[in-house]
Amino acid sequence: MEVIEGLYYSKDHEWVKVEGDKAYIGITDYAQHSLGNIVYIELPEVGAELSAGDVLGVVESVKAASDVYTPVDGKVLEVNNAIVDDPSLVNNDPYGSWMALVELKDKSQLDNLMTAEEYKKFLDEE
């Protein structure tokens, strides 16, 4: 499973890429691999105010449907409609296929997430 350095990871297998006071959120390689071929993605509304643990969206595959949770508080600034039009993009490039861009409300929440090294250890225990 690919794990990218410089990102933050949740125990629910979401990744967070921070750029200034904004963060891109998507699902990890482990998550997309576990789901199998993704056939449908539901994203949040732009402008939605989300708290850590809220449902960010839904990913459905031929095997299962899974909620995706936001690991941080934030306001949705943008969503990636390309993955709605072609959900297989997430299977092919999970770290390039972000779901939402949010304005971070509290950067200290990042301390609750895992580094790439910590996430690799977490996966080894799964």
From Swiss-Prot:
Residues 22-103 form the Lipoyl-binding domain. The glycine cleavage system catalyzes the degradation of glycine. The H protein shuttles the methylamine group of glycine from the P protein to the T protein. Belongs to the GcvH family. GO terms for cellular component: cytosol; glycine cleavage complex. PANTHER family: GLYCINE CLEAVAGE SYSTEM H PROTEIN (PTHR11715), GLYCINE CLEAVAGE SYSTEM H PROTEIN-RELATED (PTHR11715:SF3). It comes from Thermoanaerobacter pseudethanolicus (strain ATCC 33223 / 39E). Its cofactor is (R)-lipoate. One of its GO terms (biological process) is glycine decarboxylation via glycine cleavage system. Keywords: Lipoyl. InterPro entries: 2-oxoA_DH_lipoyl-BS, Biotin_lipoyl, GCV_H, GCV_H/Fam206, GCV_H_sub, Single_hybrid_motif. CDD domains: GCS_H. The modification N6-lipoyllysine is found at residue 63. Binds 1 lipoyl cofactor covalently. This is Glycine cleavage system H protein. It comes from the Bacteria. The glycine cleavage system is composed of four proteins: P, T, L and H.
